[in-house]
């Protein structure tokens, strides 16, 4: 392998996480959300691992992601929801994809695509229950619902789902989840009364799946939990019965002595306090390492944690290993993993970079190889 770093993804952990989510979901089916290249873990391998563990649906934001799954031979029911006017929806229908409809223009384009392709479109109507993002609010949703049911009667679409998204299910103190659930149930009732052919009603994200049984309905849509990360700030993956699937590591390229008072990296924001060993890790912000993790991002070399010394550069950063370090070029530096071997976790990095675990794993760039182990795509 030519690149001196890699993200090792344990597909066995993915399967175990899906099994855990199925257990929590009870009678509800599981849609594994694999958007954003499966949160940076690899779209097709993670999708296959999730399906093999019992997920019955896949979900992706972008139409291109859904078409990539189909091109790879993944034929499970797949919902895609984020597209702009003029998107190739006829191609999506010919690929046997389910489409979200969140606005009147989207319904018009889906109906047009159904006529063009000769395929009856499977539609999931989105209602905004309080997220304030995609979908229409309930007091405006009736017109879209009526138009969709007319298109269904004309044989152009089939309204197979109603869905929405939770805004604060990760906050145990918020009453918004209960209110969103109430609004969603009313939207479902209206759709059923109007004659929609509903197969699935779905609201729960990872936090809803794990903490709010009332949000489960027919189908849950976990994403970050599939890759083993906690959606909560106050509950760890281990406490939830999940295993983080990604381990980010790199070989040290330089280990050298440095005197006390040596400035490190651009701007010399870090200066050695004593004679020490400095090590270069060949990952930088071009690979998705947060630049603002300089001085804070934790890395394990051997059994010892160090923090990034100074600024993160485009392709590399520096560690101050300390005066007694016994490290050499080629030794493995672990940025994060499951924590089972004492290494930092994505949650540690999220705290260091003042962000969330979702961003830490999803932002990893395409030049970092994904190495899949423990499954069909290993």
UniProtKB/Swiss-Prot annotation:
A molecular function GO annotation: pyridoxal phosphate binding
Alphabetic keyword roster: Isomerase, Pyridoxal phosphate
Catalytic activity of the protein: L-alanine = D-alanine
Pfam families: Ala_racemase_C (PF00842), Ala_racemase_N (PF01168)
Gene3D superfamilies from the UniProt entry: Alanine racemase (3.20.20.10), Lyase, Ornithine Decarboxylase, Chain A, domain 1 (2.40.37.10)
CDD domains noted in UniProt: PLPDE_III_AR
Modified sites of kind N6-(pyridoxal phosphate)lysine: 35
Gene Ontology CC entries for this record: cytosol
SMART domains according to UniProt: Ala_racemase_C
SUPFAM superfamilies, per the entry: Alanine racemase C-terminal domain-like (SSF50621), PLP-binding barrel (SSF51419)
Enzyme Commission identifier(s): 5.1.1.1
BP term (GO), one: peptidoglycan biosynthetic process
Pathway annotation: Amino-acid biosynthesis; D-alanine biosynthesis; D-alanine from L-alanine: step 1/1
Keyword Transmembrane helix: no
Endpoints of the signal sequence: none
Its job: Catalyzes the interconversion of L-alanine and D-alanine. May also act on other amino acids.
Record-stated family: Belongs to the alanine racemase family.
Name by which UniProt lists this protein: Alanine racemase
């Amino acid at each position: 392998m030519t690149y001196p770093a890699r993200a090792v993804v344990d597909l066995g952990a993915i399967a175990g996480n899906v099994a855990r989510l199925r257990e929590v979901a009870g009678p509800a089916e599981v849609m594994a959300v694999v958007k954003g290249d499966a949160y940076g873990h690899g779209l097709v391998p993670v999708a296959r691992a999730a399906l093999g563990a019992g997920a019955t649906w896949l979900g992706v934001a972008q139409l291109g992601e859904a078409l990539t799954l189909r091109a790879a031979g993944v034929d499970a029911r797949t919902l895609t929801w984020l597209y702009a006017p003029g998107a190739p929806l006829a191609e999506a229908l010919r690929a046997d994809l389910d489409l979200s409809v969140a606005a009147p223009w989207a319904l018009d384009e889906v109906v047009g695509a159904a006529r063009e392709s000769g395929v009856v479109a499977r539609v999931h109507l989105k209602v905004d229950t309080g997220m304030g993002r995609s979908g229409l609010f309930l007091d405006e949703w009736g017109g879209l619902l009526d138009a969709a049911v007319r298109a269904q009667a004309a044989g152009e679409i089939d309204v197979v789902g109603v869905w929405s998204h939770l805004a604060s299910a990760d906050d145990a103190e918020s009453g918004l989840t209960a209110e969103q659930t109430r609004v969603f149930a009313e939207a479902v009732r209206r759709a059923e009364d109007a004659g929609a052919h509903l197969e699935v009603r779905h609201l729960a994200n990872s936090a809803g799946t794990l903490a709010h049984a009332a949000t489960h309905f027919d189908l849950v849509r976990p994403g970050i939990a599939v890759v083993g990360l906690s959606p909560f700030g106050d509950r760890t993956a281990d406490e939830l019965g999940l295993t983080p699937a990604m381990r980010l590591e790199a070989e040290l390229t330089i280990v050298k002595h440095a005197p006390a008072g040596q400035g490190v990296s651009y701007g010399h924001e870090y200066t050695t306090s004593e004679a020490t060993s400095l090590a270069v890790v060949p990952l930088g912000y071009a690979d998705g390492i947060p630049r603002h993790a300089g001085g804070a991002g934790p890395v394990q070399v051997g059994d010892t944690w160090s923090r990034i010394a100074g600024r993160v550069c485009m392709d590399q950063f520096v560690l101050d290993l300390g005066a007694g370090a016994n490290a050499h070029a080629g030794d493995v530096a672990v940025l994060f993993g499951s924590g089972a071997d004492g290494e930092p976790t994505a949650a540690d990095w999220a705290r260091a970079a003042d962000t969330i675990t979702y961003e830490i794993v999803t932002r990893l760039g395409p030049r970092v190889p994904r190495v899949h182990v423990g499954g069909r795509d290993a």
